[in-house]
UniProtKB/Swiss-Prot annotation:
It comes from the Eukaryota. It holds the Pfam family Peptidase_M16_C. One of its GO terms (cellular component) is cytoplasm. GO terms for molecular function: metal ion binding. InterPro entries: Metalloenz_LuxS/M16 (IPR011249), Pept_M16_N (IPR011765), Peptidase_M16_C (IPR007863). This is Uncharacterized protein YOL098C. Present with 8120 molecules/cell in log phase SD medium. It comes from Saccharomyces cerevisiae (strain ATCC 204508 / S288c).
Amino acid sequence: MGFKKLVSFQPDYVPQYHITKYISERTKLQLVHINHKTSPLVHGYFAVPTECLNDSGAPHTLEHLIFMGSKSYPYKGLLDTAGNLSLSNTNAWTDTDQTVYTLSSAGWKGFSKLLPAYLDHILHPTLTDEACLTEVYHIDPENLGDKGVVFSEMEAIETQGWYISGLEKQRLMFPEGSGYRSETGGLTKNLRTLTNDEIRQFHKSLYSSDNLCVIVCGNVPTDELLTVMEEWDNKLPEIPSNIPKKRPFLDNKLSHIPQSRDKVTESTVEFPELDESQGELLFSWIGVPYSDFRNDLAVDVLLDYFTDSALAVFTRELVEIDDPMANSTDCCTDYFMRTIIDLRIQGVPTEKIAATKTKVLEILKTHTIDLSRVRQVVENTKWEYLLNYEKNGESRFSSAVITDYIYGNEDGSSLVSSLKDLSDFDALLQWSQKDWQSLLNRIFVDNKPIIVTAKPSALMYEQLEKEKSDLIKQREAEFDDEKKLVLLKRLNNAKNINDRPIPKSLLQKFEIDNPSKSVEFVNTKSIATVDSYKYNNVSDPLTKKILETRPDNFPLFIHLNHFPSQFIELHFLVNSASIKDTSLLPYFNMFDELFSMPMKILDEESNVETMLSFEEVVAKLKSETIDAQINQGLKGSCPDLINFKIQCRAGGYSNSVQWIKHCLFDMVFDENRVRILLENYLNSIVEWKRNGNVMLSSLTNRNLYSARSLKKSTDPLFVEAKLQEIFAEIENGNFEKEILPRIETMRKQLRANFNKFHILVLGDISKIDDVYEPWNPLIKCLNIAHPVEKLKIPPVPRALDTISSICRTPGEKAFIITTPASESAYMNLITSIPFNLDYHDPEYAIVSLASEYLECVEGPFWKGIRGAGLAYGASMLKLCEINSWGFNIYRGADIIKCYEVGKQIVQDYASGALEFDEQLIQGAISSIINRLATIECGYFETALSKYVDEFCLQRGNNFNELYLERLQNVTKTDLKNAMQKYFVNMFDSNKSVAFVSCHPAKLESVQEFFETQGFTVEIEELEDDDDEIDSEEDENA
C-alpha cells in the first residue's frame, strides 16, 4: 500500500505547471504535487482544516507551539535551526477554517531533509507547559504586565477598527456553535486563561493524518517525493477504510451556511481612538457555494466593477467626488462552504456614516449594469489572473488546493474543475446585461447584508487605559515580592527547559554540503542597447537582432531582459534629481495620479486636438494594459527614481510605450480632478496615523533623509501641511495661477534630461516586433537634436546624496511618536556603517553575516526577545544605500526590555562573553542563500534583481556569486570585530539615533528610559485631526 493517484492534470493557461493529487491508502493523508521548474525554490504547504467553537485561541496558540519540539525531535527551535542549515525557511498562519504550515527551501535537497521532521512536529508535537508559558502568555515578574509571543501578536490588532468590525460581523453572520463565528487567533482576555490542556485536546481532536494535506510545489522529482512521503507515512497508525474522513465544518450542521439572508442586520461598534473624525462601514453578504466556480468568479468581477479603479461605481459615487463620503472602498471574499463577501467603505467622515450607508444600499439597488464595461472587467480580470499565476503560481495554486481540500470532493474532481482551464471567463464574456443584473440583484439586493458601523471613540480609549491601569494595580496588590519571585522562578525554569541545547550530531543530519553551489538559480538573458555593455552576447540571434536593428542616433537607453512569458513588464525610470526645486517634490502626490487624468489627443492629419475625459482615459488604459502605476524606486532600491510601471500582454508593448509619452506630455492636470484626488489623499492620512509601524517608518524617513529625497518629501506627515496649503489655494481659485505652473514645471524638468532615463523591458522580447519604433513619438516630443552624443548608461540617483546630517553623523537624539490607535510599540536604532556604496568592501560580507547571525530564526535575538515574549519580531535593518545599519523591534510588548536584551546580546558577543556557534554561522549563511533564492524566485523577479544589482547598486551581475564566496571565508574573529566596531554603536547614544512609535500610555516610561541612556528625546504626539505636527528643523533636512 502506498499513495494512490486521484487526479493529474496540466492547467491549459500555464502549461509549465502540472498538478497531481494522491491519497495514502493506509492513513488517508493527502499529497498534492504542483510540479514546475520556473523557480529555484521548493514550497511546502501543510494544511490542517481547523474548526474551533470558541474564542480561546487554541488553533493559533497550537500553531505556535508546533514549532517548540516534537516527540522524535524534543527540542525547542530544532525545526527552525535545522531549517537554517538546510537552506529553508518555515512559517505558518491560522485562519478561521485552516491552519497552514509552510516550508520554503532553496532546492529539493534541503526540503527533503526537513520535510519528515516538520511533519513529525505537526502530528506529534511535545506541547510542554514550559513552551506554552513563554510562547503564549505569562505575567512579567517585574512590571506585572502581559507578555507572550501570541499575546503580543493579538494585542497589536485587537483594538483596530477593521478587526473589531470583522469580529462583530462573524458574530452576526453565524450562529452559536458554528466554527465560522470564532476568533481563532484568540481574544487577549481568553489567552490569559487558556490552558495547555485545552490546546492539547484541540490537537488531539483535529491533527491526524486523515485531516492533513501535504502540498509540495517546485522542481521536485516525483519518485523521490513519493519515496520520502511513503517512508514517513508508513510510520503513522493506519486508519481503517470504514472510518469516514474527518471533514471539519462539513460535519458540523451548525457551521452550514444558509443560501441567503432575508433581512438586514445592523450593528455599531466602537474602537479606541482619540481622532474621532473618521470611521468605516462593513457590508457582508452570503455568496454562492464553493463548487459554483462560474458564479463565484462572476461575483468577483462585480466586486471589481464596483470598487476597482477610477471607473468603479463606488469610487465615482463615494470617493472621487466633491465633499467625499469615503477615502476608499475595498472588497474581499472568504472562501468557506459558501463564499462570504465583504465590502469595506473606509475613511468615512463620522458625520456622514448614516448617509454613506444609505447611499451604498441605494447604489446597489438602483444601478444598471453597463454591459460593455463589465465585459472589459472580465477581460482585465482574466489577464490579471493569468499574470498572477505566471508570476506567483505556487501561492495561487496552493491556495486553491487548500480550499478544495476543506470543501471540495474527496476524489479531486472539484480541484480539476476549479483550475483546469479558463472556460468560466469565456462563458462570462457571453453573459447578457440581463444575466449580470440578475446576479447583482440575487447576491447584493434580494440577499440581505450584515452591516457593521465602526466608530472611533476617545471615551473608549480612556476607558481601556483605565482598565489596563486598574489591572496592574490589582496585580500589584495581589503579587507581593514573594509571589513575584515565584513568577520569576517559574519563567526562568521554563526558559531553561525550552532552551536546552540541541545535540550537534542531530543538527548535522540537516546540513547541506557546499550550500552555495546546491541551488539552481533561474537564468534570464540581458540585452542592453548601448555598445559599452560588456554582457551583450553578440553571438546570440536575439541579441544580435536587437543590436543590429537599433536606429542610428537612437537617444534612449533601453535594457531588455528576455525569458519565456505571455507578458511584458515595462519600467520607465526617471531621475527625480532632475527636479531642481525641492519644494516641488511634494507635488509627486498628485503627479503619481497621471494615469487617471484627462488627456489631450492631437489628430496629426487634421491637426485637431480633442480632449478625452479621465473616464475615457482609464477605459482606454484598461483595454490596452493589465496594470499601470507610478511609484518610487525599483525593488526597494534607488528611492529617488520615479518609476512608470506598465504590465501588458506580449502584443501590447507598442501601446504601453505610448502611455509613457502620454504621461510626460498629453495628460492634463485638470483642476477638479486634482482637487478631488488631493482631498482624498489628505483624508486618508488619518487612517495611516492609526498604524504604529507606518508611523515608525514616517518618523525614521523624515529624520534620516533630507527634503531632496522623495523618501522625506513625499512622506504623508511631512507633506500634510504643504498639501493642505495647496488644497486651500485651489479652493481659493488659484489653481491656474499658482498650482498648475508648479506641477507643469516639475513634469517639464523630469522629461528634460532624456539621457537620464532608464528604460527596462522584461518578458518574451522575441514577441516584440520592433523594440525601437514605438518610442519615436516620445523622441519627437522631447525635441532631441541629432546627432546625439554617443549613448551611455545613465547615472542613477544615490540615496546617500540625500541624507540628513543626523543620518550622516548619528548621535544623541531619540525621536518618539505616539500612536493612540496602536497598542504595540515599534523601534529603530540606527548607527553609521560607512561602506559608501561599495558592496565589495571586505567588511560588507562580515557585517551582513553578523546581522543574519543575530536575527535568524532561533538566533540570539529570536531566543532573547521573541522567545521571551517581549516582541513579535526583532531584526536588523540593512540600509547600506545610506551608510546605515540598525536594530528593529516589531510589535513590541515591552520596548524597554527589548532594548536592554538586544544591547546585552550584542555586548556579550563583542566582549567574548558569548561565543559564536559554528553551526549557527552556517545556518546564517544558509538563510542568506535562501533569501537570495527568494528574491530571484521567478523570471520577472530575477530580471529585476539583476537590473538592480548591475545598474542601480552598481555591484555587477555576478555579485551574488562573489558575495556567497566571501561569506564562506568569514571567521568568528571577523564577526566579533564587527560587533566591537559597529554593532555596539547601535546602543551607544553618542553614535546612534533612536526612533520609537508607541502608545501614549507608554510615552513617559519610554522617554525616561532613553534619557537615562543618554539620548535627548524629541516627542511628536498624534491625537485628534486638528493637532498640528511639527516638522523637523532645516538642519536635519
